[in-house]
């Protein structure tokens, strides 16, 4: 009986010290959509801002390409027709995965402007 109580106590103590799972934020970024080999990236992109997974409403679509400094690799893109938006400014929403090369698991992609910001990396 004492052994069982001790074991239960030790398991509870261990579980309470387990690291919390990382929260992955849903963000919105705007930038120039480029194809690099088999990867799609957003270059000259804005800083990520908290958002929802839904498509950006018209009020949040910029009228001109923003001058951002970030690059994001886009993943989970099979549902979106990215070749149609290549070399254009797009608003991307999705799950933000911060890393050496930050990624966004795309939940929404909307064309904003039919061109990219001047000086956007090719």
Language model features: what each stretch is:
Residues 14-122:
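Conserved RNA-binding domains used in RNP assembly and mRNA/RNA metabolism
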Residues 2-18:
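Hydrophobic h-region of N-terminal signal peptides that target proteins for export
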